[in-house]
Amino acid sequence: MSSYMDLVDDEPATLYHKFVECLKAGENFCGDKLSGIITMAILKAIKALTEVKKTTFNKYKTTIKQGLQYDVGSSTISFVYHLKDCDELSRGLSDAFEPYKFKIKSNKEATSFKTLFRGPSFGSQKNWRKKEVDREVDNLFHSTETDESIFKFILNTLDSIETQTNTDRQKTVLTFILLMTFFNCCRNNDLMNVDPSTFKIVKNKFVGYLLQAEVKQTKTRKSRNIFFFPIRENRFDLFLALHDFFRTCQPTPKSRLSDQVSEQKWQLFRDSMVIDYNRFFRKFPASPIFAIKHGPKSHLGRHLMNSFLHKNELDSWANSLGNWSSSQNQRESGARLGYTHGGRDLPQPLFGFLAGYCVRNEEGHIVGLGLEKDINDLFDGIMDPLNEKEDTEICESYGEWAKIVSKDVLIFLKRYHSKNACRRYQNSTLYARTFLKTESVTLSGSKGSEEPSSPVRIPILSMGKASPSEGRKLRASEHANDDNEIEKIDSDSSQSEEIPIEMSDSEDETTASNISGIYLDMSKANSNVVYSPPSQTGRAAGAGRKRGVGGRRTVESKRRRVLAPINR
């Protein structure tokens, strides 16, 4: 066998020697070994000024191996290559490996003029299958955005993982990859290549604290960051997912992806886990999206987050979060954006919006929901000084990770898990990230109303009974202080600063108003829907999904609050 690692560091003389040794076996030569040597020789010659990537090597090696032949009598080696004109390549290899000769054919089919002129048009049929797949993906993502919220899609996929996995380890890994790639708008390989030694704690005004890690080896070889933060939907909490991952999996030595030398020693998980992730959803498709041949699996998180932010008219944030370039004013669910990793600074409100602690109002401003107390409760006591007992506990809890990841980060994770793990299955309510402001419902202090009206909060997509605390918040929101105003958050807020765990938690007092937003299913957010404010004794109307999709009703209460139907 001839693998990438066996050949990537070889000099020309070494490759020539291995080539001759392989052909001494005559017709019984090893096709895998010979195709690997030829592929590496071609890539080293053509890409003399760039790097030779492992993925490129494996792709071209497969093409060469499929049509590789050796004529012992004439010492001629023939194979098929992906270039359209292979004459120059044939001459070059014949000169480099003389006295052997090369006969290379192109796998690009020549266009027949006879066929071309007999056809109905000169339209190009190139990449027809890719266009067909893109069209299928766009259609399915469009239906996901209208008939079913993207967060509901994630929740259903998590349910599929829980019911179809055989081991806790498999469930933990699949859940981890799904959530991280979605909330970071990244490829699976970006998550895999996270350098565990770069984890650090960062303070954020809108979610309390973040964990940040660096990806040094991306597709463009420009580093980017991956973020972990609390999510208001309990099952999506990224801190808890990271804790479970560290407890279940062991660190993996960094795999070599190119001929360039990297100082990184460890990566987050093995390459095979990405393959297992794709195979799982191919075998157990939780949605028609997974059933598309060559459909988005490794890029699923990127597709979903692009669609979600595009739906909320926040495309520029998708570009910053995922480091994708976009100059097109169109839907991005196809994820056709170019790669422009450049370590862009992210606006702090982005994390509050994704976490569900902030929403986007009709004017396009990101506004707080007055949930600072809830956020502070998540981190109460977590940033206290270390003690000697915890030093021993993190080694027992996280094993080999304790030798790689910062001790401050692991203590932070362990304390957060101990305090908040019970939240995970208490309440599975999904929250909208968008305000609707209509004639019948006006926000506190808004123009056009004689007196400031109380804000209305409509819970959506409840997957079970709301917790007592959630019910109290709902009732309290109906009697919110009329004098409170919505705090508009400047998207150009100052950048987050790194906070070591030894420091005490000294957060600045914020002036966010204690106001609750209108909660509506994101997939049905429509300006044509008008809501009347509830009576003093009445109950806020519930919003769910249309009957036939999950078996729930769409505002079917006897005391219906909807005055105008949703336009489809």
UniProtKB/Swiss-Prot annotation:
Residue span(s) of domain Tyr recombinase Flp-type: 132-420
One MF term in the entry's GO annotations: DNA binding
Region (Disordered): 442-517, 529-568
GO terms classed as biological process: DNA integration; DNA recombination
Biased composition (Basic and acidic residues): 470-491
Active-site residues, as the UniProt record annotates them: Y339
Coiled-coil segments on the chain, per record: none
Keywords from the named record: DNA integration, DNA recombination, Plasmid
Keyword hit for Ribosomal protein: no
The protein's role, per its UniProt record: Catalyzes the recombination between the large inverted repetitions of the plasmid.
Protein name: Recombinase Flp protein
Organism whose genome encodes this protein: Zygosaccharomyces bisporus
